């Protein structure tokens, strides 16, 4: 049966079943038993603060108690009202967890499964129901005293947070011999200390995705992920597979490195998080933990076979029932003999589920929320929110609520987009700092006098995590004895969520028939912990490092005015100065508004900044790093690069190691030798020893690669990622200063247009965030390429060199073994030597995907080798009404005749076949491209729109790159778009797409996306809108000489078509024309197709941007043969007289409610209304009040759309919201009924056949009528009857 989550008020009375007073004996803040509420099954909540400290104190401590950030509030959960809120927040989170199958399964296991009643001190034949890690006392007040009346055996108790409110923790019980039942198979109760309304915030600045496209890239965690992460720990504890806390990766503590101080990354945390971070734990260690758990489970099974008694003896009657519960929990097998055993396959299945499926990383995907992609992410100031308010946080969507338009790009979690997310009081925060001390030399002094220390405090969390080399396991490199009995352990592959959890029927759980025995004896009271304090550390530096440079870019608080400076020292010493690394920006900002031209000045400043941050320097397109971001050096002074002069030149000389503040040199530990021997001098055993050695040799190579990967992930990538985070902060500091300067100048501005330009000024400032997102994509690409280059060029060769030396020694030993036993091996010597020689002939290849199942890492590596953009050798774009090549190869582009360039999106260019429209574009590619080798595999893609076409028109070439009858071309012949490869006049091959030339209006004039891929040794393929249309084999085209000139021109192909006159002018529009020096695959093409659609902007029927204040014919996708008309004031759709013509019916104009009047594009989520003019009278479309009638019956919640005379009053009846609904086959939108504030989506616009009222009479026959379906309209969301198209009247 489904899981039921109980509802409570904190004031509800104790009922001795679901509400009890519990005494855990663990909370040192509790002077008496605490009120507890059963959420479901074995899961309980105590809405009180929790501490294990011997002397607990909830006040902000005088010194830091953790390397992590801390938030303290002694008043939190101090009142019954606070406790009631906390209780209801936990209940709501459990309901949200329970809304997905994986969450339901998680709750089910925690609420029904039980720890083993006992531990390794318990006699093997006994169930002990009174163990201290399992039993919690139930107490009742009798007079002035609390009396124990029983006990319960929960699996999880959730309490309020510990002293540090933002540091959730899951704890369990330690046994007297310093072992944990939670780690030894038995399982144990977990106490989770958490605060659901305080959330950590992170940056997704290192991700090349669109989340930051319209705002800053900072987001808060969904509170269910915080809770579910801790529930993962609780489940590991419950199943007895918890990883010991001493299994960690520590941060480097040396003053040589800028690394987080005293941070220990626990393996247990990595397991609970999952995802890419799991690769920080070597597979050998993961296998060790799994095998250890298997041994413990075998011990548990052995105990179950021996159980004969229970403590207390009154529970002997429950022995059989508890055995069955434990057999089910551990997935043990009961043999025909009755013996309980462990089936290894069932154990592996269970272990994989617990460690690879139930992870924070997977939860984020399944609940569709934004989350950190790796465990080690940049942390920002925490936020709080009222998650009990369904308008802020609901069970289905969390913060990303569709009705508030916060579901797009996870805006509900975005700190700059959701006002409900409030930063906590900074006065209550506490940080561990590193104090940098820079002692400069006074060059003016004759004796080079050292100046006083220039101090800078940097938060510990702002430093990168650099793993200590001593924690990267090296035991795999120890000397190893090889004989005929040596075994090789192979590590299992990762498993997927789909394979395990989501295939289960989690709704059929059965009744929660849990036992809660009453026990009279007292549990042991365990001692509390002592509070540990940390001291800030001081680190001397010999130059102003990146942290000083970032500090110099921050705008000081309460500064009335400021100027930009190029001197970091000046900015550090003067609060009215801000350092910038863009000289022209400094000049323009500091000049201020000249001659009252405020808007021109602001535009110039923003354009200068955005131009600078989008700069890339290309040294060599064939190199590993495709483009350098030149301003990273002066922005962060990485490795004192500013002192070295030009950063790009320094990078070219030094390479990627210039970016690493620490650990620029990589060394592999000494590889222990193989000691080869055979105990018995027998032929088969010697041969087996040789085989085992060859297998161990392969394992040694793979182990070395794995060690290298662990080192790269924990010590190198973290440093590279830190540069991305720092650059994100730097760009935002620069943009923040620009915004502040614009505000200051606007405040002083007194022009008559001040109010009119206010919205333009705001749009200018907002555009800075958009450009920062674009710049971060460039920076992240550069950083990723550098990190991968370091792996392949700095690390991998050294590992292979060491392994080759190891191979030479091992091979010599094996040959010696064969020679020294040549008599025993008679007849086999030459064969064995050949086997050894062949085995050592080649190195073991490094396939990175053999060492990780990390999809994010795979994407990075694939980008390194096969990045789509990197393979562009031509990118023809319209930039500021000029056609240019933006690929980096700088092809020459010229225009002849009348080529019309569109100055607004989609920035296309138009070609015509005759008259004034005739023109051509000529592209001459760079001489440095070696065409014949480049085009062994190549692809071409472009968007094209062609006006109406008929089959008897002549054929036309539209794009031509043929010279001396050799090359390629694209044309239109009859109803086909044709791509042709031509070797000579007699040898060519073509592939085509049948273009719709039907007589129906829908069959022409639309934008569509064409991709042709060519593999000269394989196939030619054509894709339309990302879909594969046709594949043909490339045959006998081995000598194509490709031209460097590409001409875009409509030229008639002789002897084609029936019409020979030039009077029928053909027009077409082209945009985003690319050539790639590779064969794109289907995934590449889909990425390209989706990235070029700009899906947030609503499209008209042809695929152009839908515009405000422009006339359109409105059509329904299900009834394209109908046009919009009015019968009295009721809108109806009549049958067209000519299916080939959209120009029939009434025209509508889309009007905006509010927003930027300079941007005429209609965007998804816009609130708008529709104007219509009929016989010179103005109307609005509006929703009528009467419901529709069908078959003489009222149709519930369906209302007609009619006409209302236009007035100045804009009321809710005429207001709608629009969302794009584009797909492979057409461009359309969905229209929803909304209100003036856009806060309420009450219905969806559809179409259907109804009768409607006119005056007091009903029409006798039915009409096709547009309607609004209110109430439950979810079923219509997928219906094409709700898809509306807008055909421009002018086209």
Curated annotation (Swiss-Prot):
Enzyme Commission code: 3.4.24.69
Residues covered by region (Translocation domain (TD)): 450-865
Impact upon substituting residue 1258 to L: Receptor-binding domain (RBD) has decreased binding to neurons. Greatly decreased binding to neurons. Whole toxin has greatly decreased toxicity, even less toxic
Region (N-terminus of receptor binding domain (N-RBD)) location: 866-1093
Catalysis performed (reactions): Limited hydrolysis of proteins of the neuroexocytosis apparatus, synaptobrevins, SNAP25 or syntaxin. No detected action on small molecule substrates
Note on cofactor: Binds 2 zinc ions per subunit. The catalytic Zn(2+) is bound by LC, the other Zn(2+) must bind to another region.
GO CC annotation terms, alphabetical: extracellular region
Region (Belt), start-end ranges: 490-541
Positions with a binding annotation for a ganglioside GD1b (d18:1(4E)): 1126-1129, 1146
Binding annotation for a ganglioside GD1a (d18:1(4E)): 1119, 1247-1250, 1281
Annotated disulfide bonds: 437-453
InterPro entries xrefs: Bot/tetX_LC, Clostridium_toxin_transloc, ConA-like_dom_sf, Kunitz_inhibitor_STI-like_sf, Toxin_rcpt-bd_C, Toxin_rcpt-bd_N, Toxin_trans
First-level EC class: hydrolase
Protein keywords: Disulfide bond, Hydrolase, Lipid-binding, Metal-binding, Metalloprotease, Neurotoxin, Pharmaceutical, Protease, Secreted, Toxin, Virulence, Zinc
Region (Ganglioside-binding loop): 1269-1283
Motif (Host ganglioside-binding motif): 1256-1258
Regulation of activity: 1,10-phenanthroline, EDTA and partially captopril block cleavage of syntaxin in brain synaptosomes. Treatment of synaptosomes with a mild detergent also inhibits cleavage. 1,10-phenanthroline partially antagonizes inhibitions of neurotransmitter release.
GO biological process, one term: membrane protein proteolysis
Result, substituting residue 1179 to S: Receptor-binding domain (RBD) has decreased binding to neurons. Greatly decreased binding to neurons. Whole toxin has greatly decreased toxicity, even less toxic
Domain of life: Viruses
Region (C-terminus of receptor binding domain (C-RBD)): 1094-1291
Active-site residues from the entry: 230
GO molecular function, one term: metalloendopeptidase activity
Family: Belongs to the peptidase M27 family.
Miscellaneous remark of the record: There are seven antigenically distinct forms of botulinum neurotoxin: Types A, B, C, D, E, F, and G; new subtypes are quite frequent. Types C and D can undergo domain swapping to create hybrid types.
Protein name (Swiss-Prot/TrEMBL): Botulinum neurotoxin type C
The organism of origin for this protein: Clostridium botulinum C phage
